[in-house]
Amino acid sequence: MNISEAAKLVGLSTKQIRDYEKMGLIKPAVRSLSGYRNYGESDLERLHFIRHSRNVGFSLHQIAQLLALQDNPKRSCREVKVLTAQHIATLNQQIEQLQKMVQKLQHWHDSCQGNDNPECLILNGLNG
């Protein structure tokens, strides 16, 4: 199947697929006589894996690590669990930071009278 069909099937753009190929996340596609990329079932499975990994926030570097583990028949599930635990910790830190941002913005928003007065507590807060 060509790159457009593969992209549509796995929910990625053709550019993403080309980029993943350049990064080595997927093997270079077999080319047709006319030079078009052709993708097989194993390519689609790998692209699905990449998309699912991106959907849960793994970086491309982390995905490369996960793919290397997946490709290694002697892998240890422990290694995968460690990578996942690290990612969960990072996500929890990001959630904490976002919650602090929301609290600060909510405080400014609640303090703002929202009237025609030029004095704005939100802008004052943003000015430090």
Curated annotation (Swiss-Prot):
One of its GO terms (biological process) is positive regulation of DNA-templated transcription. PROSITE patterns: HTH_MERR_1, HTH_MERR_2. Transmembrane segments: none annotated. The keyword Protein biosynthesis does not apply. The keyword Hydrolase does not apply. Residues 1-69 form the HTH merR-type domain. GO terms for cellular component: cytoplasm. PANTHER family: HEAVY METAL-DEPENDENT TRANSCRIPTIONAL REGULATOR HI_0293-RELATED, REDOX-CYCLING DRUG-SENSING TRANSCRIPTIONAL ACTIVATOR SOXR. NCBIfam families: CueR. Could be a copper-dependent transcriptional activator of the ATPase HI_0290. This is Probable heavy metal-dependent transcriptional regulator HI_0293. It comes from Haemophilus influenzae (strain ATCC 51907 / DSM 11121 / KW20 / Rd). The lineage of its organism: Bacteria, Pseudomonadati, Pseudomonadota, Gammaproteobacteria, Pasteurellales.
